[in-house]
């Protein structure tokens, strides 16, 4: 499409491996940096793995202090509040795994509490992982346990992992996440949204564990912070809705922010052989450059679609949401009028097309998806969730 490739989607902690499935949690000393919503969820989940936990927090009285103190009553937690910033690198002595809360930048260019300690951990070969890595470990472990439980003694069943749909972008993430989950539920799937939208990734895992019912589809809203810290991620389908300059108080520069967004299409996997369906807004050059290395792609935009399976708008007196035929791009299927959306705007029409493209990775049946789309009202406005120490903004 004449768009040059952007910087490769590299993490500041790229060479540290992901968490192996055979990880011995009870013998592990895990350090959690920050105890916002994400940090608290990590702590609760780690307690279930019987890990020994240290928590470092620069605030003397973080918002979740009462819940944190209730958890602190359990012997395997060492709680350290009101620490000077930056955290002393010596804190990482004797630690096996460090989990930074997403709002803490690892970059020395930004005066935050975590960067010096993370640099020391990296130099010493200490494993650093993000909450997305814990989430991925948890769902793989649950699938493995289910496979073992259901198998005959002499038969190993193939691992049946849930579908994972991932959404990122500078704007529109929450609406698209809600849309995709609502559409799939209307189509008969057990779909669970989580991530930058509430509940957090691990709070959702814990709730599903308690219900003894994992969803068929996870619909994840992911911020650039969460993606930057992750060491491995293999979604079923992922979309980057759009990219504009944002959160340069966390990222090294705009290129670093763009690279983090591109990680939604997969981390630690071979892009040339990947089975991930990569979806993007074709009128955003940054998004299209991120998609360029990938094999399976689908686009959406405000003009008519011109590739098989792509989505767009077509003006025929009214504005129609359309999809190009998967066998003949010249044939376009009218899906519904854009004005039939209850959340009516050109921006939400793009969110709706992105949600449809994501859901098509789960089911080819368009009719129930379109019925649900006509009824979708949204209802959750932009929300600011402080995920960590000194994090003033959310939804990057």
Locate the predicted segments by residue.
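Adenine nucleotide phosphate-binding catalytic loops in nucleotide-utilizing enzymes
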Residues: 28, 33, 101, 161, ...
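N-terminal leader/targeting and accessory segments in enzymes
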Residues: 2-145, 149-151, 378-379
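Phosphate-binding loop of NTP-binding sites
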Residues: 47-48, 87-93, 102, 106-282, ...
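Anionic-ligand anchoring segments at beta-strand to alpha-helix junctions in alpha/beta enzyme folds, i.e.
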Residues: 48-51, 193, 364, 380-382
């Amino acid at each position: 499409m004449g768009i040059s490739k952007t910087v490769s989607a590299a993490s500041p902690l790229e060479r540290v491996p992901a968490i192996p499935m055979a990880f011995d949690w009870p013998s592990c000393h895990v350090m959690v940096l920050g105890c916002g919503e994400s940090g608290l969820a990590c702590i609760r989940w780690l307690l279930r793995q019987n890990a020994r936990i240290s928590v470092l927090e620069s605030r003397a009285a973080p918002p979740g202090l009462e819940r944190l103190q209730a958890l602190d009553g359990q012997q395997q937690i060492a709680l350290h509040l009101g620490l000077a910033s930056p955290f002393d690198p010596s804190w990482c002595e004797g630690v096996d795994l460090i989990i930074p809360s997403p709002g803490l930048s690892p970059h020395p260019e930004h005066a935050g509490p975590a960067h010096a300690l993370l640099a020391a951990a990296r130099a010493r070969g200490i494993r650093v992982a993000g909450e997305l890595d814990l989430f991925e470990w948890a769902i793989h472990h649950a699938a493995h346990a289910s496979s073992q439980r259901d198998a005959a003694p002499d038969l190993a069943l193939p691992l049946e992992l849930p579908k994972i749909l991932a959404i990122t972008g500078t704007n529109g993430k929450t609406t698209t996440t809600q849309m995709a989950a609502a559409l799939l539920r209307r189509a008969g799937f057990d779909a669970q949204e989580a991530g930058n939208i509430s509940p957090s990734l691990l709070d959702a895992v814990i709730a599903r564990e308690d219900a003894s019912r994992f969803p068929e589809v996870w619909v994840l809203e992911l911020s650039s912070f969460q993606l930057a810290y992750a060491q491995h991620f293999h979604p079923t389908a992922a979309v980057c809705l759009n990219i504009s300059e944002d959160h340069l108080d966390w990222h090294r520069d705009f290129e670093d922010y763009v690279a983090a967004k591109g990680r939604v299409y997969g981390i630690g996997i071979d892009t040339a052989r990947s089975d991930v369906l990569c979806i993007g807004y074709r009128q955003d050059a940054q998004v299209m450059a991120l998609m360029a290395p990938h094999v399976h792609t689908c686009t959406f935009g405000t003009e008519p679609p011109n590739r098989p399976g792509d989505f767009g708008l077509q003006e025929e007196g009214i504005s129609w949401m359309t999809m190009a035929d998967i066998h003949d791009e010249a044939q376009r299927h009218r899906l519904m009028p854009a004005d039939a959306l209850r959340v009516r705007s050109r921006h939400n029409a793009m969110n709706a097309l992105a949600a449809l493209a994501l859901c098509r990775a789960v089911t080819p049946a368009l009719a129930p998806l379109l019925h649900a789309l006509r009824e979708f009202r949204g209802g959750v406005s932009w929300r600011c969730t402080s995920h960590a120490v000194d994090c003033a903004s959310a939804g990057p």
